[in-house]
Every structure is written in structure tokens, then in C-alpha cells.
């Protein structure tokens, strides 16, 4: 029997590694819980959301100088103000869809079959986009045209289907709209801050009354582990995709999804 602390460490590592890669952290966490007995039930379903602030904090730490500059300049600098408006415009579609359909998406689609098919289809799309002859026009994630931010936000809504990947949907849409690989990845990171913070706040509000002191300790372990892991992964990811693209992650998705389908077909 795996202790809660060990479960928290393992799930924290999975969250930190997969949250900002285009491979679906939610999908990997659901499959880990299903196939490796890494927690099931209401608390562990909520746990995967409650540890996300660790990954968010990693982005804030890595990009602190840029985010602080924007925060100081958004009332006086038109470029900084336009970026803040762009992030909010990209965030808004997820809020609307989440409030209207979030409950039904969770009830109907949060199962391992959907995750596996989504991983495979998303991997094929990622591979296709990576092989296109890109002629990027946008090289600065803080200076995209406003309509581009909106379209990326709409694409992010597709990632409410588990296995699609929030970062995958936003990176792919940004590249199709003219961003280079690094700028697409960086805007995906910036958009994660309000999106994941909102998801955390909503889940915590709904479930905090049912949590015990021990539960809070378990969440704290997962938080710290996801934070440390995410800092390492994000820095390595940016360096890797700038040179090599996303094909490795596309194959990762296809292989994990295929193995998952085989396991499900065998009755796991």
C-alpha cells in the first residue's frame, strides 16, 4: 500500500513534468490514478487541481522580471496594457465555457478511454503542425495582435477535454496563427497563470470545507514537488523546442495513448 505522502510526491512529479509540456497533465494524472493505484475518490480528484499552484508559481519565478515590468507598466505603457488585455481576452472563453459546461464535461468525458483517444489524436495534430513550413510573423509573446489572443483563448477551451492538453492546444493555435515556437510556448505559460489560478480557486472554494489537516499536508507536499519539477522542466522545454520542435512530444502522446488503449482493452 502506497502512503499518501508517496502518492503526493509521484503525482506532484507528474504534474510538474507534464503541465507545461503539450502532453496533457490531466490525462497523465487520470491514467496514473487508473493504472497504478495512485489515488481515487473525491480528495484525489481535487488534489490534482490543488497542486497546480506549484506549477503556476514556477512560471512566476522564471518570468518574474518580465511579469513585474508588465505589472508596473500596464497603466502607463500602452504595450504592457495591451498585453494584459490580451491575456484577459484569451482567458475569458475558458471562464465562459467552464461555467456553462464544466460540470457536464467532467461527468461525461473524464474517463481513460477519452484520455487515450485524445492523446493519440492530439499527437497526430502536433506532429502535423510541427512539420508545416512555418514562416512565423510573431516573435514576442507579449506583442501578439489582439484577435490572435482571442483565437488562442478559444482554442484553449478544447483542452477541457481530458487528454487534449491546455498547453498543446494553445501552442498549436499560436503557431498556426503565426507565432514562432518559443513565443507560442511562452504565451501558453503566461495564459496558464490566470487559467490555472481560476481552476484552483474554484475547486478549493467547493471542497475546502471537506478537507482535513492531513489532507492539507498532503497537498503541500504535492505543491512543493510540482513547483520544483516545473521549474526544471520549463527551462529545459524552451531550450529543446527552440532547436528540435515538438515531434518528440507528439510521439510521446501517441505511445502513451496507444499503451493505455491496449491496457483498457485487456481489462485493466
Swiss-Prot record:
| Gene Ontology MF annotations | undecaprenyl-diphosphatase activity
Q: How is this protein positioned relative to the membrane? A: Multi-pass membrane protein
- The keyword Protease is annotated on this UniProt entry: no
- UniProt EC number: 3.6.1.27
What's its catalytic activity?
Answer: di-trans,octa-cis-undecaprenyl diphosphate + H2O = di-trans,octa-cis-undecaprenyl phosphate + phosphate + H(+)
Under the heading InterPro entries, the entry gives: UppP (IPR003824)
Is the keyword Transmembrane helix assigned to this protein? yes
Its localization reads: Cell inner membrane
Q: Which GO terms describe its cellular component?
A: plasma membrane
| NCBIfam families per record | PRK00281.1-2, PRK00281.1-4, undec_PP_bacA
Explain the purpose of this protein.
Catalyzes the dephosphorylation of undecaprenyl diphosphate (UPP). Confers resistance to bacitracin.
Under HAMAP family, the record lists: Undec_diphosphatase
The name on file for this protein is Undecaprenyl-diphosphatase
Amino acid at each position: 500500500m502506497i502512503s499518501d505522502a508517496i502518492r503526493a510526491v509521484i503525482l506532484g512529479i507528474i504534474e510538474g513534468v507534464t503541465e507545461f509540456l503539450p502532453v496533457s497533465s490531466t490525462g497523465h494524472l487520470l491514467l496514473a490514478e487508473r493504472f497504478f493505484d495512485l489515488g481515487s475518490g473525491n480528495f484525489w480528484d481535487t488534489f490534482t487541481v490543488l497542486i497546480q499552484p506549484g506549477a503556476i508559481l514556477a512560471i512566476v519565478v522564471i518570468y518574474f522580471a518580465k511579469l513585474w515590468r508588465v505589472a508596473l507598466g500596464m497603466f502607463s505603457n500602452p504595450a504592457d496594457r495591451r498585453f494584459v488585455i490580451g491575456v484577459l481576452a484569451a482567458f475569458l472563453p475558458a471562464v465562459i465555457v467552464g461555467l456553462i459546461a464544466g460540470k457536464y464535461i467532467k461527468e461525461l468525458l473524464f474517463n481513460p478511454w477519452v484520455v487515450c483517444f485524445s492523446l493519440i489524436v492530439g499527437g497526430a495534430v502536433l506532429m502535423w503542425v510541427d512539420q508545416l513550413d512555418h514562416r512565423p510573423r510573431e516573435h514576442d509573446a507579449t506583442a501578439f495582435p489582439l484577435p490572435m489572443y482571442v483565437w488562442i483563448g478559444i482554442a484553449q477551451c478544447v483542452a477541457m477535454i481530458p487528454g487534449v492538453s491546455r498547453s498543446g492546444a494553445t501552442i498549436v493555435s499560436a503557431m498556426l496563427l503565426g507565432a514562432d515556437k518559443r513565443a507560442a510556448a511562452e504565451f501558453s505559460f503566461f495564459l496558464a497563470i490566470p487559467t490555472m489560478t481560476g481552476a484552483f480557486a474554484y475547486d478549493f472554494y467547493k471542497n475546502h470545507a471537506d478537507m482535513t489537516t492531513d489532507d492539507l499536508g498532503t497537498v503541500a507536499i504535492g505543491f512543493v514537488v510540482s513547483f520544483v519539477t516545473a521549474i526544471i522542466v520549463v527551462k529545459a522545454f524552451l531550450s529543446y523546442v527552440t532547436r528540435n520542435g515538438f515531434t518528440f512530444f507528439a510521439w510521446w502522446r501517441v505511445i502513451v495513448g496507444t499503451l493505455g488503449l491496449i491496457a483498457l482493452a485487456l481489462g485493466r
